[in-house]
From Swiss-Prot:
GO MF assignments: rRNA binding; structural constituent of ribosome
Description of how the protein assembles with itself and partners: Part of the 30S ribosomal subunit.
Localisation: Plastid, Chloroplast
The name this protein goes by in its record: Small ribosomal subunit protein uS11c
Chief place where the protein resides: plastid
Record-stated family: Belongs to the universal ribosomal protein uS11 family.
InterPro entries found in the cross-reference section: Ribosomal_uS11, Ribosomal_uS11_CS, Ribosomal_uS11_sf
């Protein structure tokens, strides 16, 4: 005869305390990834193992259209991402920058002003060895 599978009641699952796992972690060291394209800037903060702690983009911070690629949007994006992880105890970080957008320097300045000590700063911009054909010049 087959054993019956015991199921928990939905009442028990509903009254469980809800708490975010990401805010409970303490992360003293981390990696800040800055991806600066011509149209947007994305800042992702991970722990040393590579698990994402938080991320922010210029579009998610309220900038729309052309303003997403501006240095001010990149600065605001970096400040929002860093503010979250500083409250979780991060005080040392490695910064990896990728892309050639206008916001990369502004995002880096915002990270330096935040009080997080930089252990390493590395440029990870992919350089083609004459790969894909670039988009044509814009005529205005």
């Amino acid at each position: 005869m087959a054993k019956t599978i015991r199921r928990y009641s939905s009442f028990r699952l509903r009254n469980r305390r809800i708490r975010s796992r990401k805010s409970a972690r303490k992360i003293p060291k981390g990696i800040i990834h800055v991806q600066a394209s011509f149209s947007n800037t994305i800042v992702t903060v991970t722990d040393v193992g590579g698990r994402v702690v938080t991320s922010a983009s210029a579009g998610a911070c309220g900038f729309k259209g052309r303003r997403r690629g501006t240095p001010f949007a990149a600065q605001t994006t970096a400040e929002n991402a860093i503010r979250t992880v500083v409250t979780q105890g991060m005080h040392r970080a490695v910064v990896l920058v990728k892309g050639v957008g206008r916001g990369r320097d502004a995002a880096l300045r915002a990270i330096l002003r935040s009080g997080v000590r930089l252990h390493l700063l590395r440029d990870r911009t992919p350089l083609p060895h004459n790969g894909c054909r670039p988009p044509k010049r814009r005529r205005t």
